[in-house]
Amino acid sequence: MTSPATNKPAAYDFLVKLLLIGDSGVGKSCLLLRFSDGSFTPSFIATIGIDFKIRTIELEGKRIKLQIWDTAGQERFRTITTAYYRGAMGILLVYDVTDEKSFGSIRNWIRNIEQHASDSVNKMLIGNKCDMTEKKVVDSSRGKSLADEYGIKFLETSAKNSVNVEEAFIGLAKDIKKRMIDTPNDPDHTICITPNNKKNTCC
C-alpha cells in the first residue's frame, strides 16, 4: 500500500475568476457548458442563483485554472450580483443576436459593472447564437461598434455549433495574463490570481 504524496506538484499556477453577464435567455449557461464540458442543451433553463464551472488551460507554459461564474440576468438577481462581481478579473458581456432588447441592455450591464467591479477588470462583448442567421436582428457591425465605443474586444459565438467559444474564454484569459504581467503591483492580483503553491485565500 502506498502512502499519499506529501509534496504533490501544483495542479495549476494561477486561479482566475471570470463572469458571464447579460440578460436571461441569451445563452450564458450554454456558453459555459460548451466551454467547460464540451456539451450543449437546446432546452432553456433559467439559472437559479449562482453556479460556476472550472476548466484548467495552459497559456505560455503556465497552467491557469479558470473559475467561470454564471448567474441569471433578471432584475431580481441584482442583489446577488453585487457580491458576484467581487474579485472578478474578466467579464464576458453576452447578448443574443436574435434579440434586440438583450443588445440594448448591454449599456446597463456595463454601468452595473462600473459600479460594482474593479476598474481594471478585462471585458469582452459577445454576440451569441450567431448560427441563427435567419433570425438575426443585431448586425455584427453594431456589436463591433459598441465594443469599440467601450474599448473592449468583440466576438460573435454559437454555443450550439461551438463557434468562437474557445476563442472568447481563452482570449479573455490571455488579456488578463498580459495585464497581470504589465501591472504586477495591481492589488487585484493577490485576490483573484493566486499561485497554487501559496496559502492565500482566493475569491
Swiss-Prot record:
Membrane topology: Lipid-anchor
SMART domains linked: RAB (SM00175), RAN (SM00176), RAS (SM00173), RHO (SM00174)
Keywords: Cell membrane, GTP-binding, Lipoprotein, Membrane, Nucleotide-binding, Prenylation, Protein transport, Transport
GO molecular function annotation: GTP binding; GTPase activity
Coiled-coil portions: none
Keyword Transport attributed: yes
Name of this protein: Ras-related protein Rab-8B
